[in-house]
Amino acid sequence: MTIFTTAIEQASDILWNSLLLFLLVGTGVFFTIRLRGVQLRRFGEGVHRVFGNFTLRGKKADDQGMSSFQALATAIAAQVGTGNITGCATALVSGGPGALFWVWVSAFFGMATIYAEAVLAQRYRTTVNGKVTGGPAYYIRAAFKGTFGKVLAGVFSVLIILALGFMGNMVQSNSIGDAFHNAFGMSHLAVGIVVAAIAAFIFLGGVQRIAAVTEKIVPIMAAFYIVGCVVILVMNYKALPNAFTQIFVLAFNPQAMAGGVAGVTVQQAMRFGVARGLFSNEAGMGSTPHAHALAKVNHPREQGAVAILGVFIDTFVVLTLTGLVLITSGLIPEGLTGTALTQAAFSQAFGGFGPVFIAICMFFFAFSTIIGWYFFGQSNFKALFGEKALPVYSVIVVVFILVGSTLKVDLVWAMADFFNGLMAVPNLLALLALSGVVAAIDKE
């Protein structure tokens, strides 16, 4: 298993260092320029559309789609996951505190990318057997005509099923297992069985149950975690100035001051910052367009503005708070990583309740991502094999959730990095090819 893990890590490093680091950020920069800073221009509109008409008793999702808020909640359910707790910790351990700066850079430009994704998902969505559907596979076929477009769309669908439905959900169940083992001493397998059983129940309910669950879980879990982080930062307020100094200085010179991680280079800080940023906010990955395609809006531009808000909440609020808590704790150079590092940081403030707090948050964060990623994979599985084959997909996902809870954390993260990177490539190429369409829609 060690040889296999090493091989996956090396393949992932080649993919990220030689291609994705530049393609992801470059695409975001391109759309920022072409759309004239759309992430700033449309940000206020996104806030208004989500919260201006927000009610706890919104419209129910149906075969014709879901409300704009439900679409955002489903997207954020996928975005706000273990990447905000475990992923942030691994980024800081592998890339040093400066990695958080590169997370911010990729997220800022990623907001322009996700705007393009949501706009195209709305523009090229379709109705199949009376049900609205959409996602990158549809706009990939529009971007590249003929056989090449069909093949590339098929490749994307296979990759997203592997990356999110299977490998990605292994990461989520693995993180829940780690958190509950550290907090309560529960076996990873027992936790995996419980998570798999709850997931199976929700999967059986289809898009209506998915939307109903996510629109209720997401606001509560985010508020719960944010309050916990803010309490710790208030307690550690004297360490905040040094934390921000570390973030900005170590982003360009990882060995320049105390608090850095030995042996880390600028390229590693960038690589892990961008990679973990992608895993967290999913801008450019091609996942969240499946949710945004279903939003009932009057114009594609409206859902694009809403999508921008998802990246902001995920990265600039939730992930940033985690990063600041970890940096101010001073525990990054201590040899801990992943969930254990975050639990140790919270233990400093909350004592024995710290690991329990993170375990509770991890369950809701990771489980909401399982729901969102199942839905994204389901859309592509149905497109490839038909609706009658969906029970097979559901069973396979449940098995991967169960198995993932028992594997070593480095293996599941290595596989997730690799497959997430692969699926982003055809999506980003299609976005660039259809940039003219996005620009035209933005001006309408």
Residue ranges and their predicted role:
Residues 1-78, 82, 93-98, 110, ...:
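N-terminal alpha-helical transmembrane segments of multi-pass membrane transport
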Residues 3-4, 34-39, 83-88, 164-176, ...:
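Transmembrane helix-loop junctions in multi-pass membrane proteins
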Residues 23-30, 35-47, 156, 173-180, ...:
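Membrane-interface loop-to-helix entry segments
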Residues 37-66, 90-100, 104, 112-147, ...:
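Flexible loop linkers connecting adjacent transmembrane helices
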Residues 56-93, 123, 128-137, 141-143, ...:
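Alpha-helical membrane segments and immediately flanking helix-loop junctions
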Residues 109-117, 193-207, 218-238, 271, ...:
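Selective recognition of specific alpha-helical transmembrane segments in multi-pass small-molecule
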